[in-house]
Amino acid sequence: METWQELKVTVKREGEELVSNLLIELGAQGVAIEDSMDYVGNVDRFGEIFPEVEQQEEIVVTAYYPETVDVATVESDLQARLAELTDFMDLGEVKMGTTALAEEDWADNWKKYYEPARITHDLTIVPSWTDYEATAGEMIIKLDPGMAFGTGTHPTTKMSLFALEQVLRGGETVLDVGTGSGVLSIASSLLGAKEIFAYDLDDVAVRVAQENIELNPGMENIHVAAGDLLKGVEIEADVIVANILADILIHLIDDAYRLVKDEGYLIMSGIIKDKWDMVRESAESAGFFLETHMVQGEWNTCVFKKTKDISGVIGG
């Protein structure tokens, strides 16, 4: 029987996506997130509110590695990568610990963290192994979070989905930059976009996105490819969406302005509070006008329009 290794990394909530993606890059076969906030204010399908639980500033990212992987080296490499990023993000005191578990435990252990989650008015994310019956008007996104990139319930993803609901009316061309799990592309298709082109620099993300897309019927209008932001892209779009770190976002803004159609939208998420002014000023300097600004905790998401200036703030 094969033995797996479970590496737990405790970090501030803001570091969830960053640490998850780094662990995948370092060979993890699956990642699970433990976050007390997942239960706070959550409402199930019958209107029952889950009991309040103690809200922690920290979350636990659990990564699973085969016994053949030297997890001590993974820990060392992760510490080194995180040390390079301390100027960009406050990760708090990073703590790590490793335990061994049998294959049957690995097969089920990470699944216990994932349940169907109603993310927006219309969209519900459902783990691929769950038998879930949609209610009237409910749109289902099937994901396999065991492969990589979490379940799509991170605040930056949630706000991106809200923004897509806000701007998509049907028939649009969408560019999804840094697609990760592919959740934003799948949502765009469900919300009526005609064509979606999804890009990611990471070959693992390209594969995972394609696999998640195939879990959802009728997604033939989504095209996934490896790409470095919008470099070399010549597709005009009605909507461009990017949920990546702020220091990377600013490098795609000029290309986004070139590619987005008049009256089109640029949705940007993954912006921590300290980087918001930098991103806003960069977008406005390129010619965009801020239409909507959403805030949840330390995270910011924004909707910019190419020609129209309507400002609004939604706080969360």
UniProtKB/Swiss-Prot annotation:
EC number: 2.1.1.-
Keywords: Cytoplasm, Methyltransferase, S-adenosyl-L-methionine, Transferase
Catalytic activity: L-lysyl-[protein] + 3 S-adenosyl-L-methionine = N(6),N(6),N(6)-trimethyl-L-lysyl-[protein] + 3 S-adenosyl-L-homocysteine + 3 H(+)
This protein's record includes keyword Signal: no
Coiled coil ranges: none
GO molecular function: protein-lysine N-methyltransferase activity
GO BP terms, alphabetized: methylation
Residues the entry annotates as binding S-adenosyl-L-methionine: T157, G178, D200, N243
GO cellular component terms, semicolon-separated: cytoplasm
EC top class named in words: transferase
Subcellular location: Cytoplasm
Annotated Pfam families: PrmA
Family: Belongs to the methyltransferase superfamily. PrmA family.
Role according to the record: Methylates ribosomal protein L11.
Name of the protein in its database record: Ribosomal protein L11 methyltransferase
Source organism of this protein record: Streptococcus pneumoniae (strain Hungary19A-6)
Gene: prmA
